[in-house]
Amino acid sequence: MTSFKIVIVCLALLVAVASARSRDMMSDDERDYHFSKRGIPCACDSDGPDIRSASLSGIVWMGSCPSGWKKCKSYYSIVADCCNQ
């Protein structure tokens, strides 16, 4: 009887997962806008040497810069890059 209950619960979970609706997909333009507004600001080399007065025109991306973005900091980091469009 216990194994029957386990089978019923597993089937119910399988149906719940299989019938889940996916979120509406954003267009590429909407996705680019949301990506550009997300993240931690960073100072590019063009912002100047003083971090306190810099405009922080870059955004930190984990890994490497996505397509359409370029690395704007001269030093190399394994974990993240400072990128701007």
UniProtKB/Swiss-Prot annotation:
Where, by tissue, is this protein expressed? Expressed in ectodermal glands and in clumps outside of the extodermal layer. Is not expressed in nematocytes. In adult female tissues, shows similar expression levels in mesenteries (gametes-producing tissue), tentacles, pharynx and physa.
Query: Which residues get removed as pro-piece?
Result: 21-36
Chief place where the protein resides: secreted
Q: Which InterPro entries match?
A: Myo_ane_neurotoxin_sf (IPR023355)
Q: What functional role does this protein have?
A: Binds to site 3 of voltage-gated sodium channels and inhibits the inactivation process. Is highly active on DmNav1/TipE (drosophila) and is only extremely weakly active on rat Nav1.4-beta-1/SCN4A-SCN1B, and on human Nav1.5-beta-1/SCN5A-beta-1. This reveals high specificity for arthropod over mammalian channels. In vivo, when released into the medium, this recombinant toxin induces impaired swimming, paralysis and death of the crustacean A.nauplii within several hours. Also causes paralysis of cherry shrimps immediately after injection at very low doses.
Miscellaneous comment as given in the Swiss-Prot or TrEMBL entry: Nv1 toxin seems to be encoded by 8 different genes. 4 of them code for identical precursors, whereas 4 others code for very similar precursors. In the genome draft, 6 additional loci are also correlated to Nv1 toxin, but they are not predicted to be functional genes. This high similarity may be explained by concerted evolution. The primary structure of the mature peptide is identical in 9 entries (AC B1NWS4, AC B1NWS1, AC B1NWR6, AC P0CH90, AC P0CH46, AC B1NWS8, AC A7SCE5, AC B1NWR7 and AC P0CH45). Additional information can be found in entry AC B1NWS4.
Q: Where in the cell is it found?
A: Secreted
What Gene Ontology terms describe what this protein does at the molecular function level?
sodium channel regulator activity; toxin activity
Name the record gives this protein:
N.vectensis toxin 1 7
What family, per the record? Belongs to the sea anemone sodium channel inhibitory toxin family. Type II subfamily.
One cellular component term from this protein's GO annotations in UniProt: extracellular region
What keywords are annotated for this sequence in UniProt?
Answer: Cleavage on pair of basic residues, Disulfide bond, Ion channel impairing toxin, Neurotoxin, Secreted, Signal, Toxin, Voltage-gated sodium channel impairing toxin
